[in-house]
Amino acid sequence: MSDWNPSLYLHFAAERSRPAVELLARVPLENVDYVADLGCGPGNSTALLHQRWPAARITGIDSSPAMIAEARSALPDCQFVEADIRNWQPEQALDLIFANASLQWLPDHYELFPHLVSLLNPQGVLAVQMPDNWLEPTHVLMREVAWEQNYPDRGRESLAGVHAYYDILSEAGCEVDIWRTTYYHQMPSHQAIIDWVTATGLRPWLQDLTESEQQLFLTRYHQMLKEQYPLQENGQILLAFPRLFIVARRTE
């Protein structure tokens, strides 16, 4: 599990793209020339940006070679760069930085967010969506299984919080629009939940385990999911998935 799996990630493409669509709808820009899609993955969010601004120069950034290869194949009219978001520098100031479900993987948001704002043109926009599910059963149970089986904590940090992000971006010279939405995804089984998180949040927990250790982890995780996510009357499972949205426009 050394690299991301584009096929597994795109298995829930509609559910993963919906927050990107809703974030993009709130971006208050009509015409843009330079756009960066940070953590572009296989290009599903980049495609939305290209549809809205077909004449713009859009650059997708991702640290995964597999994801970059998939994105380049899908969107030959866009530019893609394999790089760490924290170290990448654009060739010119940007009109829009779009980051859909990527920045939650990076530490030090008190430094990262002002840095990203500094890459914007005056009146440029930083648009961010981050999963806010650190306290949801899907992620709490990952930590509990790891503790039970004596594995180190490899999960990502919790988000800083609404008030913290508002202050960070206001102090960086931005007008800030911030909101939180909880999606309820209909899942056909508890295994489907595992398939979902295996492509993202569960990756760091499994990546250094042997095949047999992974199986033990997933078996126990599956048992605990059944306790936390009851079946609906029609046999479906509702997976609550909170997400934090931020649209910050540079005014200084």
UniProtKB/Swiss-Prot annotation:
Q: Where in the cell is it found?
A: Cytoplasm
Instruction: Kindly list the GO molecular function terms attached to this UniProt entry.
Output: trans-aconitate 2-methyltransferase activity
Q: What is its main location?
A: cytoplasm
Lineage: superkingdom: Bacteria
Q: Name its GO BP terms in alphabetical order.
A: methylation
Listed under catalytic activity are:
trans-aconitate + S-adenosyl-L-methionine = (E)-3-(methoxycarbonyl)pent-2-enedioate + S-adenosyl-L-homocysteine
Per UniProt, the keywords (alphabetical) are: Cytoplasm, Methyltransferase, S-adenosyl-L-methionine, Transferase
- GO CC: one term? cytoplasm
Q: Which SUPFAM superfamilies match?
A: S-adenosyl-L-methionine-dependent methyltransferases
Q: Which InterPro entries match?
A: Methyltransf_25 (IPR041698), SAM-dependent_MTases_sf (IPR029063), Trans-aconitate_MeTrfase (IPR023506), Trans_acon_MeTrfase_C (IPR023149)
Q: List the disulfide bonds.
A: none
Enzyme Commission number(s) of this protein: 2.1.1.144
Keyword set includes Endoplasmic reticulum: no
Protein's job: Catalyzes the S-adenosylmethionine monomethyl esterification of trans-aconitate at high affinity and of cis-aconitate, isocitrate, and citrate at lower velocities and affinities.
By sequence similarity, the record places it as follows: Belongs to the methyltransferase superfamily. Tam family.
Q: How does it assemble?
A: Monomer.
The name of this protein is: Trans-aconitate 2-methyltransferase
